[in-house]
């Protein structure tokens, strides 16, 4: 339960803000909460506390956060653009100050990462980043839990990500490097992860002795991989680029031929929703090496660990 003590009163905006030990503590707490639920143990330490959830992007993230808060004994309140004045001139700072009068924690899923940072700056409550265009730390924590559950270690594990260098790739770079995995990202030229995330992961890799690779060759990334990860080629807000992206990313499809380069017992991960026939074939997505639905389930436990730790 060290995570509950060490993160009390902190915001959860990016894994860049957390040490290796703090991330491992969060994962241990998530695993403990998962075991409690599996055993049917009622655990409600957040009774009397309310979470507000702000969504500027439609998402299934609401389900896992809301269920998690309820299971911990608290309440969750969903807010979209129609419930707030953000789209009609109210500043993020004012919204933060107002909501601070009512709730103890807020989860926001938005486009600009700056909005999350500004919300945290002006709020007297804790803030959690449900997703921005730059980062997806809650998903990355669930991914780490999924990866860890199989071998109970990160040492000697190679994670390969193939596809768009988006928010998921940014978060995974940092997450993998911090827990001691080798990580390789393969993406088309011009679609690489953000420079600051690559540089941060490389700095961590130098300290931990792990390899961080960004390449344009999917075979280089997947060679000898223990875990293979991909995401959609066209994210929300990029619909006008869809036709172009389908052409550019076609060589980066995770298919039966590509996964031959990985270890035979590789696991396939995807943050969902998936487009079978685009970034991944149905054979890989629905095959015996796929753990995508277990991965989705782990969002609940990872997010419960975050909520319990910061409140």
Curated annotation (Swiss-Prot):
One GO CC annotation: cytoplasm
Residues reported to bind L-ornithine: 167, 231, 235-236
Keyword Amino-acid biosynthesis: yes
Pfam families cross-referenced by the UniProt entry: OTCace, OTCace_N
Localisation per UniProt entry: Cytoplasm
UniProt KW GTP-binding keyword: no
Sample GO molecular function, one term: ornithine carbamoyltransferase activity
Binding site for carbamoyl phosphate: 85, 109, 136-139, 271-272, 299
UniProt-recorded name of the protein: Ornithine carbamoyltransferase
Organism expressing this protein natively: Geobacillus stearothermophilus
């Amino acid at each position: 339960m060290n995570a509950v003590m060490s993160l009390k009163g902190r915001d959860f905006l990016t894994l860049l803000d957390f040490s290796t030990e703090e991330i491992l503590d969060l994962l241990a707490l998530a695993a403990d909460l998962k075991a409690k639920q599996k055993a049917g143990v009622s655990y409600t330490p957040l009774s009397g506390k309310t979470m507000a959830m702000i969504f500027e992007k439609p998402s299934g993230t609401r389900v896992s956060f809301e269920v998690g808060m309820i299971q911990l004994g608290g309440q969750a309140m969903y807010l979209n653009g129609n419930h707030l004045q953000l789209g009609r001139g109210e500043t993020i700072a004012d919204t933060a100050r107002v909501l601070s009068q009512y709730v103890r924690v807020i989860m926001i899923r938005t486009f600009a990462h700056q909005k999350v940072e500004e919300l945290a700056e002006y709020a007297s409550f804790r803030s959690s980043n449900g997703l921005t265009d730059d980062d997806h730390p809650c998903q990355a924590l669930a991914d780490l839990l999924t990866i860890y559950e199989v071998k109970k270690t990160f040492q000697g594990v190679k994670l390969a990500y193939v596809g768009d260098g988006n928010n998921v790739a940014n978060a995974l770079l940092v997450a993998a490097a911090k827990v001691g995995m080798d990580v390789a990202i393969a993406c088309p030229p011009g679609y690489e992860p953000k420079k600051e995330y690559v540089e941060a992961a490389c700095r961590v890799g130098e300290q931990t002795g792990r390899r961080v690779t960004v390449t344009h060759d999917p075979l280089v990334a997947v060679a000898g991989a223990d875990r293979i990860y991909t995401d959609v080629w066209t994210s929300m807000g990029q619909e006008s680029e869809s036709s172009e992206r389908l052409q550019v990313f076609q060589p980066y499809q995770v298919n039966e031929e590509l996964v031959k380069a990985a270890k035979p017992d590789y696991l396939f991960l995807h943050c969902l929703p998936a487009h079978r026939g685009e970034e991944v074939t149905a054979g890989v997505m629905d095959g015996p090496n796929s753990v995508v639905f277990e991965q989705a389930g782990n969002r609940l436990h990872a997010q419960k660990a975050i909520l319990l730790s910061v409140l």
